[in-house]
Amino acid sequence: MSELGAKYQQLQNELEEFIVARQKLETQLQENKIVNEEFDQLEEDTPVYKLTGNVLLPVEQSEARTNVDKRLEFIETEITRCEKNIRDKQEELEKMRSELIKLNNTAASTGPGR
């Protein structure tokens, strides 16, 4: 029973890690959407710079837009994957919770004095 409890705790920790990862991805998604909105407000000839280390380097606006679009696509794919992991872990936890309840009920009905 304690082994099952430890496994259940481990699954809860894994689920929590997936949820935190999902939240980080959501933050990144929102940040990149804001950058995309900023690009929409720029004139075509407005210079765009990329921070590399401590240096701002000029980049083509089209290249910067493409990079942000690719990043958005990647983040959305990661969010989908992360959400699937969360669902799978929740299902696993629910099955284990049912097992623990059954074991608890069995132990209670066959416990001392019965």
UniProtKB/Swiss-Prot annotation:
Which CDD domains does the UniProt record give? Prefoldin_6
Q: Is Chaperone one of the keywords UniProt gives this record? A: yes
| Residues with the N-acetylserine modification | S2
Where found, per UniProt?
Nucleus
The Gene Ontology biological process annotation of the record reads:
chaperone-mediated protein complex assembly; positive regulation of transcription elongation by RNA polymerase II; protein folding; tubulin complex assembly
Keywords attached to this entry: Acetylation, Chaperone, Nucleus
Q: What is its main location?
A: nucleus
* Record carries keyword Chaperone: yes
Q: Which domain of life is it from?
A: Eukaryota
Q: Which GO terms describe its molecular function?
A: protein-folding chaperone binding; tubulin binding; unfolded protein binding
Sorted alphabetically, the Gene Ontology cellular component annotations on this record are: cytoplasm; nucleus; prefoldin complex
Q: Which family does it belong to?
A: Belongs to the prefoldin subunit beta family.
More details: Present with 784 molecules/cell in log phase SD medium.
Tell me how this protein assembles.
Answer: Heterohexamer of two PFD-alpha type and four PFD-beta type subunits.
What does the UniProt function comment say about this protein?
Answer: Binds specifically to cytosolic chaperonin (c-CPN) and transfers target proteins to it. Binds to nascent polypeptide chain and promotes folding in an environment in which there are many competing pathways for nonnative proteins.
UniProt name for this protein = Prefoldin subunit 6
What gene is this protein translated from?
Answer: YKE2
